[in-house]
UniProtKB/Swiss-Prot annotation:
Free-text comment on the cofactor: Binds 1 pyruvoyl group covalently per subunit.
Catalyzed chemical reaction(s): L-aspartate + H(+) = beta-alanine + CO2
Pathway: Cofactor biosynthesis; (R)-pantothenate biosynthesis; beta-alanine from L-aspartate: step 1/1
Annotated gene: panD
Organism: Lactiplantibacillus plantarum (strain ATCC BAA-793 / NCIMB 8826 / WCFS1) (Lactobacillus plantarum)
CDD domains: Asp_decarbox
InterPro entries named among the record's database cross-references: Asp_de-COase-like_dom_sf (IPR009010), Asp_decarbox (IPR003190)
EC main group: lyase
Taxonomic lineage from the root: Bacteria, Bacillati, Bacillota, Bacilli, Lactobacillales
Pfam families: Asp_decarbox (PF02261)
Protein name, UniProt field: Aspartate 1-decarboxylase
Amino acid sequence: MLIDMLKGKIHRATVTQADLEYVGSITIDETLMEASGILEYEKVQIADVNNGARFETYVIAGPRDSGVICLNGATARCASVGDKVIIMNYAQFEPEEAKHAKPYVVLVDDENRLTKRVRYEKHGLLAEEL
């Protein structure tokens, strides 16, 4: 049996663009992708902090250090430019592996520049908070 577990997330990024006419997906700054462990074309779940919507799509790499968070295609209807979003990816683990999984948390400023990369520890606390 495999268990779906959080692998990493980009916390409270700001949506910078929305392109309804694009084929689909979310474009994410490549620096943020690498820091959170998100791969190009990987499925992600997005939670809009402003309106509570949750939706899934796949990722396209955006220019490194550009701060881009662009909702493409139908996902452009799920959040507005300026909204804060949480972008999460998941992995499947065997139960014993899952007990020791510690997801990456990528924190950004209002321009989506990486400010900190930490791991979750016990009880949802970040490593630095223990």
